[in-house]
């Protein structure tokens, strides 16, 4: 849902954890099914206001799923906070996931956070919560894969539950059976897009986790200049954002700073966060050897 110039917009992170079911692992293999369950559970709070709460991205950590939620409108956010405070959101998520996994019980634990901290302890102070959520404007577009799932589900007649269940089952069986290299690059290949570097022609493709990890391991103190070069064509990588990354991950070292830089680039640009753009930024800063290493990586991350 596109926000108008005067529309109230904000975002928040919703952390979901279960001690009985490994949610990150399940999500990897049942992405469409779990995404639809979470989307359905969260939309219960909108009371008919379609697209007023949107899941922009789902991150996986070791033990939990982290949903990046966008609110379009003050009232939907107020209703969500009210339902969350009364544990209705948690119960909806629990029930939907329980049905997904066909288990009798599925206790879950949730937590709301913004960039500067958690919100659960402030739920009695609604105005303060709304202020913090409003201040955290969404900085990324919807994840390409989630948008693709949305489009597929829209094409199904929602008044036919059997058709929806059949489609979700098919999607998940395909996700489980595809080889990792095929699954991870499904629909991402840029047909016919090539570029030249040091006299050789290369096929462009979106950045993978292997590219990000190799960059973070190799770039060292030059991560900031590369970030500024990328920032010329990526609004999310402005000087303030780069300095915030430097400060926030200072204790974690340059690897983590560089890693988070490319994660932000990829999250904000989606499919447009390509190898070519990173290679150009590296070349601009005289880091041709790193660029060549990245170009030599296979899809499995090996040279």
UniProtKB/Swiss-Prot annotation:
**Compartments it resides in:** Nucleus; Cytoplasm; Cytoplasm, Cytoskeleton
**Pfam families, per the entry:** Death, TRADD_N
Q: By its UniProt entry, which InterPro entries does this protein fall under?
A: DEATH-like_dom_sf, Death_dom, TRADD, TRADD_N, TRADD_N_sf
What are its GO cellular component terms? cytoplasm; cytoskeleton; nucleus; tumor necrosis factor receptor superfamily complex
Instruction: Tell me the GO BP annotations in alphabetical order.
Output: extrinsic apoptotic signaling pathway; positive regulation of canonical NF-kappaB signal transduction
The sequence motif named Nuclear localization signal is recorded at: 224-237
Where is it mostly found?
Answer: nucleus
Q: Does the keyword Nucleus apply?
A: yes
A molecular function (GO) term: transmembrane receptor protein tyrosine kinase adaptor activity
User: In what residue span(s) does the Death domain sit?
Assistant: 208-298
Per the annotation, the residue ranges of the short sequence motif Nuclear export signal are 141-157
Q: Which UniProt keywords apply?
A: Apoptosis, Cytoplasm, Cytoskeleton, Nucleus
The record's domain comment reads:
Requires the intact death domain to associate with tnfrsf1a.
Q: Which function does this protein serve?
A: Adapter molecule for tnfrsf1a that specifically associates with the cytoplasmic domain of activated tnfrsf1a mediating its interaction with fadd.
Describe its assembly: Heterodimer with tnfrsf1a.
Task: Please identify the protein, giving its name as recorded.
Answer: Tumor necrosis factor receptor type 1-associated DEATH domain protein
What taxonomic ancestry is recorded? Eukaryota, Metazoa, Chordata, Craniata, Vertebrata
Gene name?
Answer: tradd
């Amino acid at each position: 849902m596109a926000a108008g110039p005067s529309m109230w917009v904000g975002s928040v992170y919703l952390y979901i954890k279960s001690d009985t079911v490994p949610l990150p692992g399940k999500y990897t293999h049942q992405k469409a099914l779990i995404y639809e369950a979470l989307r359905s559970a969260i939309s219960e709070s909108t009371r008919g206001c379609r697209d007023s709460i949107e899941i922009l991205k789902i991150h996986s950590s070791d033990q939990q799923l982290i949903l990046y939620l966008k609110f379009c409108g003050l009232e939907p956010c107020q209703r969500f906070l009210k339902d969350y405070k009364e544990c209705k959101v948690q119960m909806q998520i629990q029930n939907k996931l329980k049905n997904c996994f066909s288990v009798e019980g599925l206790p879950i634990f949730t937590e709301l956070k913004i960039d500067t901290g958690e919100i659960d302890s402030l739920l009695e102070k609604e105005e303060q919560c709304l202020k913090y959520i409003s201040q955290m404007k969404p900085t990324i577009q919807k994840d390409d894969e989630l948008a693709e799932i949305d489009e597929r589900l829209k094409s199904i007649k929602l008044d036919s539950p059997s058709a929806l269940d059949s489609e979700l089952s098919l999607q998940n069986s395909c996700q489980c059976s595809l080889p990792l290299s095929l699954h991870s690059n499904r629909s991402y290949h840029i047909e016919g897009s090539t570029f030249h570097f040091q006299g050789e022609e290369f096929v462009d493709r979106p950045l993978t986790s292997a590219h990000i990890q190799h960059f973070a391991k190799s770039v060292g103190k030059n991560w900031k200049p590369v970030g500024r070069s990328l920032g010329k064509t990526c609004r999310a990588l402005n000087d303030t954002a780069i300095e915030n990354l430097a400060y926030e991950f200072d204790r974690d070292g340059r690897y983590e700073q560089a890693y988070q830089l490319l994660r932000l680039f990829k999250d904000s640009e989606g499919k447009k966060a390509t190898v070519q753009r990173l290679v150009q930024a590296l070349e601009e800063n005289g880091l041709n050897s790193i660029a060549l290493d990245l170009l030599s990586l296979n899809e499995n991350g090996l040279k």
